[in-house]
Design a protein with these regions (language model features):
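N-terminal signal peptide c-region/cleavage motif recognized by signal peptidases
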Residues: 13-16
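C-terminal/domain-edge helix-coil "capping" segments
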Residues: 41-56, 94-97, 106-116, 153-161, ...
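N-terminal segment of the mature soluble domain
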Residues: 43-65, 119, 123-131, 135-181
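A short, hydrophobic beta-strand-centered structural micro-motif
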Residues: 75-83, 123, 180-213
Length: 258
């Protein structure tokens, strides 16, 4: 289990949204068969996944009794499909829920919904090992590390992407090894401007034998947040993305019953 520490430094900030998440009320999970009993059994599990995406903040859901809603989960299903996992070929069930009905129920429960238009985040994922350093770019989208980040972000309805790391980026970041900090003077700020992202994230990964320590820093038009996750790589990356999603959801949630 990775450990996570969080410190907030508020400098200034304004609200802006860049990307609309299209599948907020859709999710999937592995199943053992395609019969009706199996589908009904897993519906509540998939609805829980959707609620995390829609509400955004895990702590807000934890404070509510969702048992009644989950018991009626099947009533909110608008579409279902049986699929094969493209990686391991396991069967999975994908469900789509009624967005308007869910938002109305959540609003009645006093839960705020995170709007489907969400800040788009550029993530500089930097791996340091001794004197060597590597920054993941667009050509590394198939890497295990980025796939973990992308999957965790997808589960939270958070739009993220990698920089190109082309010659332009490489030239501007040639002196970053001794400057892994995120502030207005950071060498990562200038090359980030070309991407037009709402959030600039710097995730510095340092390997310690079997585990890693990841320092997360991000800026949103002057607002800086810094936290750290430690543990096995996949776990530490997922924890960092979850903390980012919780922080953003806490700032941008609105009641949306349309």
């Amino acid at each position: 289990m990775s450990r996570l520490f969080f410190v907030l430094i508020s400098l200034m900030g304004t609200t802006s949204f860049a990307a609309e998440v299209a599948d907020l009320c859709q999710s999937h999970t592995a199943i053992s068969s395609q019969n009706e009993v199996e589908r009904q059994r897993t519906t509540a599990t998939i609805l829980q996944q959707v609620l995390v995406k829609v509400v955004g903040k895990q702590s807000a859901l934890a404070k509510k009794d969702l048992s009644g809603l989950l018991e009626q989960a099947d009533q909110f299903v608008t579409h279902y499909a049986h699929e094969r996992d493209p990686v391991c070929a396991n069967q999975q069930l994908r469900l789509t829920f009624n967005e308007k009905a869910l938002n109305q129920v959540l609003s009645a429960m006093g839960l705020l919904s995170w709007h489907k238009s969400r800040p788009e985040s550029l993530i500089w994922l930097v791996f340091s090992n001794g004197n060597s350093q590597r920054i993941l770019g667009a050509e590394d989208q198939g890497s295990t590390a980025y796939q973990v980040v992308k999957q965790a972000a997808r589960q939270r309805g958070l739009p993220v992407f990698l920089p190109l790391m082309d010659l332009q980026d490489q030239h501007q970041l040639r002196f970053t090894q001794s400057a892994l900090t995120m502030d207005e003077d950071s060498p990562f700020v200038q090359p980030s401007r070309r991407y037009g992202a709402d959030i600039i994230i710097l995730a510095s990964v340092v390997t310690h034998q079997q585990d890693v320590s990841i320092t997360w820093q991000w800026l949103k038009e002057g607002e800086l947040q810094r936290y750290q996750s430690e543990g096995e790589l996949s776990s530490a990356l997922s924890e960092g993305v979850n903390m980012l999603a919780d922080a953003l959801a806490g700032e941008f949630t609105v009641v949306d019953t349309k």
